[in-house]
């Protein structure tokens, strides 16, 4: 009797599992009717409010990789408070990656690079524009577009060398007299940043 009950139970579980599991093709794309269905349902509940945007409203197709290497590199250089360069076509950009100076030309392999304090130079013909970057990231895409995001950046020709020397001396003094780990860390950051600026100006 126990064996018969076990067989009946296993059959019922298998039948329930086969009914609950439906096969369908895996897809990361949203159904085309999803947005319209959501909007209609939203209007029934809150007719006086605009419906929020669904994830598909922010989705864009991935840019296609060109069949030939472009002659120019398109650069977008963005800071938290402004866009320094937007869709700027240049010949080359040299960025201060955490692994060392990185030259970026049209057709560069797709890369994400962390930026350290240092000089970024933008080359357009014989014109070279240099910026001091505090930190950030560079996103290099297969379609020869470079998105460079920096926490802070200053054109190199806007920096006063005497103020850099003064700041370096102040932070070196703070580092020597620091008594807590926090004071040491803050002073060390100041020394490293001012040293990088000083090296860029003297180089």
Curated annotation (Swiss-Prot):
The similarity annotation says:
Belongs to the ATPase epsilon chain family.
Keywords (alphabetical) are: ATP synthesis, CF(1), Hydrogen ion transport, Ion transport, Membrane, Mitochondrion, Mitochondrion inner membrane, Transit peptide, Transport
Q: Which GO terms describe its molecular function?
A: proton-transporting ATP synthase activity, rotational mechanism; zinc ion binding
What the entry lists under HAMAP family is as follows: ATP_synth_epsil_bac
Q: Which PANTHER family match?
A: ATP SYNTHASE DELTA/EPSILON CHAIN, ATP SYNTHASE SUBUNIT DELTA', MITOCHONDRIAL
Specify the domain of life of the species encoding this protein.
Eukaryota
What name has this protein been given in UniProt?
A: ATP synthase subunit delta', mitochondrial
Its GO CC terms?
mitochondrial inner membrane; mitochondrion; plastid; proton-transporting ATP synthase complex
Q: Where in the cell is it found?
A: Mitochondrion; Mitochondrion inner membrane
Entry function:
Mitochondrial membrane ATP synthase (F(1)F(0) ATP synthase or Complex V) produces ATP from ADP in the presence of a proton gradient across the membrane which is generated by electron transport complexes of the respiratory chain. F-type ATPases consist of two structural domains, F(1) - containing the extramembraneous catalytic core, and F(0) - containing the membrane proton channel, linked together by a central stalk and a peripheral stalk. During catalysis, ATP turnover in the catalytic domain of F(1) is coupled via a rotary mechanism of the central stalk subunits to proton translocation.
SUPFAM superfamilies reported in the protein's UniProt record: Epsilon subunit of F1F0-ATP synthase N-terminal domain
* Span of chain positions assigned to the transit peptide in the UniProt entry: 1-26
